[in-house]
Regions:
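N-terminal FAD-binding dinucleotide-binding subdomain shared by FAD-dependent oxidases/monooxygenases
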Residues: 2-16, 20-198, 202, 211, ...
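Active-site-proximal cofactor/substrate-binding loop regions of enzyme domains
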Residues: 215, 231
Length: 414
């Protein structure tokens, strides 16, 4: 639905914020003197903590590293790794304390963003960004946002803004689904196939019913897959319980807690001095040289942590030792805290690991590249989300082209 003279864009604020998750409500608080308008597609704040969490989901970072600097966690004696429900309570307390809820329009899904500023301001020297980006508020609207209310796809209201803050995140909304050859996909499987995004929508009773007494296969070995395997093991206790098989292509480093040989984890990666060990974008020649000179120290720290993890966890026993150094997973946020008793359930046979690079479906389960077959009733794809596709779906050109980074990673400010 295009903007026309009969349907001109509404201008109610200078600044728009898309998303009311952690970043969205923080941005709203910081920009409160501009009375920003926040568009949230769902009926509540919280983002992934509300829509992409299991019953057992907990924070992966220490509580003190996740709280807002201007709003300490109210219950200081609570768990160091709060549950997703405790995090939602904290976010609601933050939003109420700083009165940001008044700026949020719920059930308002942004479906398109347009840049309507002077096209001559598009400067190749800034990677295709308009030169206005150096003056955040140019004094006149340069962005138009199309919004659907209450999932009414036939009706789009347009709004005009001087500045837009995109806080929709990388995770949720668009699942990353593997591609399969003809007659090798989910359509030939007689059981149930779902992505973790769909599993998150189940309440505890429905989730237990789905897993209990079923042969479950979880594809993936990152945090969502590990948590799901643990929930499956809990639902299948007793002699009638079935085992859960995790299909692992690339093992990633996992940690039991945030202490290494008795030393706090933050000592290795969260101090001011440790920042000199790691490369950063646009860091300059001198800092790059210093980082190069300190690379043996960086490697030594990584091996020191790996030695602890290999001693503490049975990674080699289950062929789950990663081939890459620990620092790679830490730097790319692919490290996960393993749930308590996870390997105890593996020792009891409730969680089984299967290493495989390629697999496909057959009528009774999944088949591997060596032609071996695994029977299954339920297959859950813990294969992540397509954050790049999610952003490209609303960003206009040339801005969406900035997501196509040579390394394949999504370039973020921090």
């Amino acid at each position: 639905m295009a903007t026309t003279l009969d349907n001109p864009p509404i201008s109610v604020s200078k600044i728009a914020i898309i998303g009311a998750g952690v970043s969205g409500i923080a941005a709203s608080k910081q920009l409160s003197h501009h009375n920003p308008l926040v568009f949230e597609a769902s009926d509540s704040i919280g983002g992934v903590w509300r829509h992409c969490s299991y019953n057992s989901t907990k924070l992966q970072s220490h509580r003190r590293d996740y709280e807002f600097s201007d709003f300490p966690w109210p219950q200081r004696e609570s768990s160091e790794f709060p549950t997703h429900l405790e995090i939602l309570d904290y976010l609601h307390s933050y939003a109420e304390h700083f009165d940001v809820l008044k700026n949020i329009r719920f059930n308002s899904k942004v479906v398109e963003i347009r840049y309507v500023g002077d096209q001559e301001d598009l400067s190749s020297s800034f990677g295709g960004l308009p030169s206005d980006h150096r003056t955040p508020l140019p004094g006149h609207p340069v962005w138009e946002i199309g919004v659907q209310k209450n999932n009414q796809s036939d009706s789009i209201q347009w709004y005009a803004f001087e500045f837009v803050v995109v806080c929709i995140g990388k995770y949720g909304d668009i699942p990353k689904i593997p591609e399969f050859a003809c007659n090798k996909g989910p359509d030939v499987f007689k059981g149930r196939v779902m992505h973790t995004l769909d599993y998150c929508k189940l309440d505890q009773e429905a989730a237990t019913k789905l897993l209990e007494g079923k042969k479950v296969v979880v594809v993936g070995f990152k945090k969502s897959g590990i948590d799901l395997a643990m929930e499956c093991a809990k639902a299948n206790q007793g002699p009638q319980g079935q085992s859960c098989t995790m299909v692992v292509r690339t093992p990633h480093w996992i940690v039991p807690h945030y202490r290494i040989w008795g030393l706090p984890f933050s000592m290795f990666y969260s101090t001011r001095s440790s920042q000199f060990l790691h490369e950063r974008p646009n860091q300059g020649v001198l800092k790059a040289l210093l980082c190069l000179l300190l690379s043996p120290v960086r490697s030594g720290i990584s091996k020191f942590i790996e030695s602890y993890l290999l001693r503490k966890l049975p990674l080699e026993k289950y062929e789950l030792k990663p081939e890459h150094p620990f620092e790679e997973d830490y730097a790319s946020c692919q490290m996960a805290i393993v749930p308590e008793n996870f390997f105890s359930e593996a020792d009891k046979g409730k969680i089984v690991f299967k290493r495989a690079s390629n697999w496909s479906f057959w009528s009774g389960g999944i088949e591997f590249e060596d032609n071996s077959k695994l029977e299954a009733d339920v297959v859950v794809l813990a294969t992540g989300f397509d954050g790049k596709k999610k952003l490209k779906s609303i960003l206009p050109r040339p801005f969406c082209s900035l997501l196509d980074y040579p390394s394949g990673l999504m370039p973020l400010y921090r």
